[in-house]
Amino acid sequence: HRFTESAAEDLAYWKKHDLKKVERIKALLDDIKANHPRGIGKPEQLRHQKSGLWSRRIDREHRLVYSVEENTVTVYACRYHYGR
């Protein structure tokens, strides 16, 4: 998997402020590799301007927003709800 610059900033924030979120993100990414489009975090295909992207819950407030192309998972955000 790879992280966009924005998603890498989100992950760096969690590494500094909440390691449980980092663990959850890692678990979600492992599950995406194994089970996409099903699995943990209530996977949801996004619509409209975010077409082609998927979302999974990190917690009530925060979402992991990503795409899957061939065998590559690209993470676009992992903080807040569907981006800023």
Positions of the model-derived regions?
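Low-complexity, intrinsically disordered/propeptide-like segments
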Residues: D31-I32, Q49
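Conserved N-terminal entry element of GNAT/NAT acetyltransferase domains
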Residues: H1-F3
